[in-house]
Amino acid sequence: MQIKIKSIRNFLFRNKIYGYLITKNDEYFKQPDNLNLDILRKLTDFTGSFGIAMITQDQNYLFVDGRYTTQAQKESGRKFKIIKIDLLKKFIDNRFKKNKNIAYDDRFFQLNFINRFYKGKSNFVPHPFSLPNLKNSNKTEVFEFDKKYHGLNFDKKFKKIKNLIKLNNDEALLISSSENICWLSNLRSKNVYNPIIKSKAILKKNQLFIYCNIKNIKKSSRINKKIRLLDENKIFSDIKYFKK
């Protein structure tokens, strides 16, 4: 296991946290592009397509879909107790006493998932832990999708959205879905695993800003001039600019 359970457990004791949730998703709520970027796999050795690990101060649990219990037991059962993922909430409510903190990194969990637990006995708290920053180091080209496949070009889609939303100069629309961003911009990557560009975007009155892992992107000269590709970490400071 390339990620040490001991380091997570030390983090729990230092911060007086009882348990920590780790999912297979990345910050775009997508599965990793390849196995080398899979944090859950590096922690548990589990190679299935979905799962959630919980490391507590004294136990390790791996919650998986019922289809994967045999596989998970074989791959991870030596160090993890395997439980069906649909029992996760019941397990937490029944197992842990009131006021025990369960932490998670809110970059990797959707709000509707976490909201299921806030009325339970345990306290769910967002608390990032410095897991390895596993990023794809291979550069990939971003290009404009051929017009025979996209139906409408970016300018026409952009105009339709502006007519529908009618943004003022000091307003913007945050887009969190990578698929929606790629549809609007007609951009794709040459990633062999998935052509969708993992990204978030801010749509302003006259421009679309796409925030992605810019260091690993080779930009095509054909990209529309109203589209700007920016570093993914810059989105936080840019969002603050629009706060009133």
Set out the residue ranges of the language-model regions.
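N-terminal accessory/capping or targeting/presequence segment of soluble
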Residues: 1-95, 109, 113-242
